[in-house]
C-alpha cells in the first residue's frame, strides 16, 4: 500500500495434541488440545477508510498483530447395535490471547470502528449432546446445545463485559417406512440471554414443525413441510410467523427418464419473518421479506 511492501515472517511452535480411548466396542472418548494463530482480514490492516455499508465506516490499523487461541475439547460417542442407541457428546473451551477487537463509536445511526490487540481475555464454552434410538420403524432423537461466551467490548471509548448464554433443546420423532408414508415431528425450544452491562435481554423461541412425505401408487411422490415459530421478547411482547410448502411429483416407473413436478412455496402467503437477536455491541431486530406464494411446474429428465 502506498508503494510500500510489508512482510511479517515469524517462527512459532504451536502444540497440537489428541488422544483417543476406546472404552469398548462402539464406545470411545477423545481429548484434543491445540493452540492456533488467528490472522485478521487485510481490510483491518489497510491505512485508510473502508465503507462497509451505508452507515458503517472502518479505519484500518496497520500495527495489528496476530492473536493466539487455546482450544480444548472432549468428545464421547457410543453406538449400541443391540438396542440401536446412538449417543454423542462434545464439550469445548477456548480462550483468546491478544484478541483483535474493535473500538466502536456511534454518531446517531453512523457507526465507525477501528481495531487493536486487546489484553482482555475472551472465553467461550460450548456443550452439545445428541441421543438417538430406533424402535422398529420409529426413530426418536433429542439434540441439546449450550453455549456461553464472554467478550470484552469497547463502545464510545468505554470497556464493558458482554456475556451471552444460549440454550437449545430439540426433540424429534420420525418414522422410517419403505412403502408407507413417513412423518417427522420436531419441536425446537431456545433461550438466549445477553448481558451487556447495564442492559439485559432474554429471547425465548418456540418452533414446532412437521415434515410429511408419501410414495403413492409407485408413481407419485408427495412432500409437505410446515413450521410455526414464536419468539417471546421478554417484555410481555411476542412475534410469530409460519411457513408451509408442498410438492407433488410424478414418475411413470423407477426407470423412467422423465419426472413432472408441481411445487408450491409459501402457501400461506406470509410477507416477512421477523427475528430478534443480540451481538457483542447491540440488540437488533431483523426482518426477512419472503417471496409471495409461488407455484412452479418442473420437468426433469434424467440422463
Locate the predicted segments by residue.
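Exposed, low-structure sequence patches enriched in small/polar residues
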Residues: 1-303
